[in-house]
A protein has these predicted regions:
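Class I S-adenosyl-L-methionine-dependent methyltransferase catalytic core
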Residues: 1-69, 73-223
Length: 223
């Protein structure tokens, strides 16, 4: 699809209410995200495939020796992830930074992003989910988050109201910290019925490390 065809497709959204499924990603965000994850996971750029485009059918793409790095419709993300997991497709996908996707916490890894203003004007708390990481459950890289947000806006920070051993994607502040999959105790919804989106009960040690990372980044932390 050419740039002109892409712009023409985007134009039909102009007079409609904006939703995350109507978003299209600024080129500077695409390039920055690709650079970061190609470096983080040693991805060969020639192997990247972007199956989510007007008229595309991700279920019938040829994924042989490919890695998906794309921004899919968020409303279909759980179905897409399940399809890729079932078929052994490697992926790094944009996702809603508040809700995440499915509760496959033993299989997926979330990279904290930030608020991105998409080219249709929608402001979306954007994170990234992948199945290419066997040990880390949540990765927070302050430099990545800061630079991502500066590409389109100044962004905002989320106020955390959870205990030191509780975490959700939306409450991970911009700092340098990694949660290992082995440090997850259980899904947070087993003890916090008021919690929204992907979240975990984690070990005290992981919570203390997170506190220290946030303190170094200049945030007020939990006791």
């Amino acid at each position: 699809m050419t740039d002109e065809e892409y712009k023409a497709w985007c134009a039909h959204f102009d007079d409609r209410p904006k939703t995350t499924d109507d978003c299209y990603t600024p080129r500077q965000v695409i390039d920055f995200v690709e650079d970061y994850f190609c470096s983080y996971y040693n991805i060969d750029r020639s192997k990247i495939i972007r199956p989510f485009y007007p008229g595309g059918d991700y279920e019938h793409e040829d994924y042989t020796d490919k890695v998906v790095l794309d921004n899919p419709p968020f409303s279909l993300l759980a179905k897409i992830v399940q399809f890729y997991q079932k078929n052994g497709v490697k992926f790094v996908l944009y996702c809603n930074g508040t809700t995440g996707t499915t509760k496959m916490h033993g299989l997926l890894t979330y990279h904290i992003g930030g608020t991105v203003i998409y080219e249709n004007g929608a402001r979306v708390n954007t994170a990234f989910v992948t199945n290419m990481n066997e040990t880390e459950a949540i990765v927070s890289d302050r430099d990545f988050s800061d630079r991502l947000e500066k590409l389109t806006n100044k962004g905002t920070r989320v106020k955390c109201q959870y205990e030191i051993d509780e975490i959700t994607l939306a409450t991970v502040k911009k700092c340098d910290w990694v949660l290992l999959k082995s440090e997850i105790i259980e899904d947070i919804h087993k003890t916090r019925k008021d919690s929204f989106g992907i979240g975990y009960k984690i070990t005290k040690e992981a919570g203390i490390r997170r506190n220290e990372a946030e303190r170094k980044a200049g945030y007020v932390t939990r006791n």
